[in-house]
A protein has these predicted regions:
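S-adenosyl-L-methionine
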Residues: 2-88
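SAM-dependent nucleic-acid methyltransferase catalytic core
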Residues: 178-291, 298-299
């Protein structure tokens, strides 16, 4: 019998402390050294590592991630931890999956995945991308969906869509509801629903709607009427089937056959949950090698206002879902909820397994959630390996009264890294 040898344990805190960022093709630079500070969490000294940790190679993300979703991190973040802290066949988990960045990236890298999100739209947008369809089969399925010219809309959407576009959307919605109700819903239907959900509203002709806010920020009917008046616009016809095909081509443009096979293999074993992240009894104890996630922050997202069209299209009761989603306005309430999440993460994490917990700066940096999270994790039994502050400097171009300005800006990720004692 052949015994597979696992690589030596990766000391991530030492790696981060010694890391030097070198720009591509700069052969003579010694690189930008990591700045290391220490903070005291209760009586525990926790290192804080600051640098630009993603390399130019790591910044090249797969096109399969190009799905709009509010407050999502870039694929480079989970890839960094998945590559260093797991091996093929290990299980990667995200308790707040969102659009599925961690799940898709783990699948691309040959890991098993467990996804959870209290928002049912998460699974609708994530799961289908593990099963990339054959283009001919997809086109045939789309052409087979009949357009009902007499279908009536249960809500007024004339301010968003041309009447013929709306007929196509309503026909597709009814088709998907019927297929699911009769148990005929398959991978092709899931893919069509995912892409259509992403194309419902947006700010270019690549979307079904007239010009409106980006797709992750749906506006109300009254607000759209005002936008139409301000822009002196009326909805033009959009060919929904053609747009679904073109968005599909965009999503798979740089996905290799090997990656498609890896995603499908991960999808075949994947577990998708729609539970409170504090109560995921389906996940067995000590089975997860790595969790990479970003939780909901302090009342920064208005679920019902942002997602009412997406929920309507997918026959989801938006107010019911909104009530289930954590929107803590007080830091004390947020800490209490996250303590429950970390208690559950400790239960399901393997010995020597890791958690990478990304948090942002909220309320203009007045509340540093990373320090709160470090304390929460330590109190639940984890070892805090450090706080990783990834600072990516970029140049942003603005144009004011014909004068161009290049301003230096910084995108910052704060990731608190934990390990379970082995």
């Amino acid at each position: 019998m052949t015994t597979l040898l696992r690589r030596a344990p990766f000391e991530i805190d030492k790696y981060l402390a010694d890391f030097r960022h070198v720009e591509k093709n700069d052969l003579f630079s010694k690189g930008q050294a990591t700045k290391t500070d220490r903070i005291i969490i209760d009586t525990v000294s926790v290192p804080k590592f600051t640098n630009e940790f993603w390399t130019s190679r790591q910044r090249q993300a797969s096109s399969i991630h190009e799905i709009s979703y509010r407050a999502c991190f870039k694929p480079q973040l989970p890839r960094f931890f998945i590559e260093f802290l797991t091996e093929e066949g290990d299980t990667v988990y995200d308790p707040f999956t969102g659009r599925g960045t961690t799940i898709i990236e783990a699948g691309l890298l040959g890991r098993n995945v467990i996804s959870n999100d209290i928002n049912p739209l998460s699974q609708i947008l994530c799961k289908p991308r593990l099963f990339i369809p054959d283009m001919t089969q997809l086109q045939d399925r789309l052409q087979a969906i009949k357009i009902d010219k007499k279908v009536a809309s249960p809500i007024n959407l004339d301010m968003f869509y041309h009447k013929n576009t709306l007929q196509e959307i309503l026909s597709l919605r009814n088709y998907l509801i019927e297929r699911e109700k009769t148990g005929q819903h398959d991978e092709l239907d899931m893919w069509i629903r995912m892409v259509a959900t992403n194309r419902l509203t947006g700010h270019s002709k690549g979307f079904f709607s007239v010009y409106t806010f980006p797709p992750n920020q749906a506006v109300s009917q009254d607000r759209q009427i005002k936008i139409n008046k301000q822009r002196e616009q009326i909805p033009e016809y959009r060919d929904t089937k053609k747009l679904i095909m073109s968005k599909t081509l965009q999503l798979i443009k740089n996905v290799s056959k090997e990656q498609i096979a890896r995603l499908r293999a991960a999808g075949g074993k994947a577990v998708f949950l729609n539970d409170d992240a504090r109560e995921t009894d389906v996940i067995k104890k000590q089975t997860v090698s790595l969790t990479v996630t970003s939780p909901p922050f302090l009342d920064v997202v208005q679920y019902a206002a942002d997602n009412w069209i997406r929920c309507w299209f997918n026959n989801i009761a938006v107010e019911s879902v909104s009530r289930k989603i954590t929107m803590s306005k007080k830091i004390e309430d947020w800490v209490d909820i996250m303590s429950g999440v970390f208690k559950e993460l400790y239960r399901i994490t393997k010995k020597s397994g890791f958690v990478a917990f990304e948090v942002g700066e909220v309320r203009n940096g007045k509340i540093m959630l990373d320090e709160y999270v470090a304390k929460i994790g330590i109190n639940q039994g984890f070892i805090c390996k450090g706080i990783m502050v990834n600072e990516q400097v970029f140049t942003k171009t603005s144009n004011l009264w014909g004068i161009s300005n290049n301003d230096r800006g910084t995108n910052t990720n704060r990731i608190v890294i934990f390990q379970k004692d082995g």
